[in-house]
Amino acid sequence: MAGHSKFKNIQHRKGAQDKKRAKVFTKLIREIVTAAKTGSSNNPENNPRLRNALTAARSQNLPKERIDKALNSANESSNNENYTEIRYEGYAPNGIAIIVEALTDNKNRTAAEVRSSFTKYGGSLGETGSVNYLFNHCGVIQYPINIASNEDVLEAVIEAGGHDIISDDTTHTIYTDVENFSKVLDFFTGKYGIPEDSYIGWIPLNTIIIDDKEKAAKLLKLVEVLEESDDVQRVFGNYELSDDVYEIIQGEP
């Protein structure tokens, strides 16, 4: 795994998402509906994807009544909402690889929006598979650092069958193989409660350090615009901000 400093970028993006709570909720609800409709069962006990979606929703404080409404909606025979999972890959300026995961009911619309965003901010959208070799596809589970000691969490990772763990000043980040994600997430949820975040995503094998404020601002604007789309679930990139640039950007309104 690359160094933990890349999570500065995740935390920066997470902060931007927190300011757009309605959009975050929309994405969570879309995943719940999709998981309930496409899984083997609409019972989370028998549907790992739905169980994962519900855990993610609770970690973001999606109100219970909205979760229940989404589940009821998915079970209605009149519900014609069908979403397709699509992955877009391309490059931001300065050779930064970007992966965009989307759930959409209109592939043409979403592709046009994603392509337009890449172009507007100096990037280029490539073919699916053009950059994913630069990333590790894995499960990620995050807890606040004070949930337990590094040693205790490491023991839990080993017991649960996790792949790796990185602990920094604020966060325990647990990595899992995609195949074991649900099992490990269930174990940690039972032991430590709902995590701060949990998902299957793309973690860069190596990162490019951005040490120029203007370059960082342009890159983060592209990421922000992509994430503002209701169709986009998550955005990943193989970059990290230098300490100086990170502090400057964090200090801006």
UniProtKB/Swiss-Prot annotation:
Residues 1-21 are annotated as: Disordered. GO terms for biological process: regulation of DNA-templated transcription. GO terms for cellular component: cytoplasm. It holds the Pfam family Transcrip_reg. Keywords: Cytoplasm, DNA-binding, Transcription, Transcription regulation. Belongs to the TACO1 family. NCBIfam families: PRK00110.1 (NF001030), PRK12378.1 (NF009044), YebC/PmpR family DNA-binding transcriptional regulator (TIGR01033). This is Probable transcriptional regulatory protein A1G_04400. It comes from Rickettsia rickettsii (strain Sheila Smith).
